Amino acid sequence: MGRTLVLIRHGQSEWNLKNLFTGWKDPDLTEKGHAEAIAAGKKLKETGVKFDIAYTSALQRAQKTAQHILEQMGQSDLEMIKSAALNERNYGDLSGLNKDEVRQQWGEEQVKMWRRSYTIAPPNGESLRDTGARIWPYYLYHIQPHILRSQTVLIAAHGNSLRALMMALEGLNGEEIISQELATGIPIIYTFNPDSTISSKTIITP
């Protein structure tokens, strides 16, 4: 299976469970999060996918998700490259705060703009556009060359960083991407044509 890219949002983290804005903070996976990653690895093994290289962010929730997947696939020794370019969107001053409490303080509409607007960033944080501006060049220079050499690549990262990447891959606009939701621990498999356009997209459901 050449020219293949598998994206997966990390398994549930401790801060997902506590309903906190996480961003660049580094909480561990919950027990459920570990189980989600293990289940994803088993599902991917069933598809016949075999990875040539893996990429992940600098944050442990994504790294441990990738490790679980590779272990389940019998590829625990595979090279795994870690880069902050793949980190979650930086939520700035909201990081570590409870989402419901932030809504009470700032109002539902303001928080919705911070979370779902393509261009508006929370205080001292990143917008989704900012996130894409660091992820897309990294993808083009470091990850896409593997795919163009007919290799299969795993990226274990985060909800917003992967949404920003998917936006560029699929040619979505700012309005279209804000409606895209990524569940934890669910693999998305892209295959590509020789000219790097998408040939197929498959979501591996539990």
UniProtKB/Swiss-Prot annotation:
Which residues are noted in the entry as substrate-binding?
A: 9-16, 22-23, 61, 88-91, 99, 115-116, 159-160
One Pfam family it belongs to: His_Phos_1
Pathway, per record: Carbohydrate degradation; glycolysis; pyruvate from D-glyceraldehyde 3-phosphate: step 3/5
Q: Does the keyword RNA-binding apply?
A: no
Note the CDD domains from the entry: HP_PGM_like (cd07067)
- What is a single molecular function from GO for this protein? phosphoglycerate mutase activity
* Ribonucleoprotein in keyword set: no
Q: What is its EC number?
A: 5.4.2.11
Q: Where is this site: Transition state stabilizer?
A: 158
InterPro entries on file = His_Pase_superF_clade-1, His_PPase_superfam, PG/BPGM_mutase_AS, Phosphogly_mut1
Choose any GO biological process term that the UniProt entry carries and state it: gluconeogenesis
Function, as annotated, reads:
Catalyzes the interconversion of 2-phosphoglycerate and 3-phosphoglycerate.
Q: Family assignment?
A: Belongs to the phosphoglycerate mutase family. BPG-dependent PGAM subfamily.
Quaternary assembly: Homodimer.
Q: Which NCBIfam families match?
A: pgm_1, PRK01295.1
The molecule here is called: 2,3-bisphosphoglycerate-dependent phosphoglycerate mutase
Taxonomic lineage of the native organism: Bacteria, Pseudomonadati, Pseudomonadota, Alphaproteobacteria, Hyphomicrobiales
**Protein encoded by which gene:** gpmA
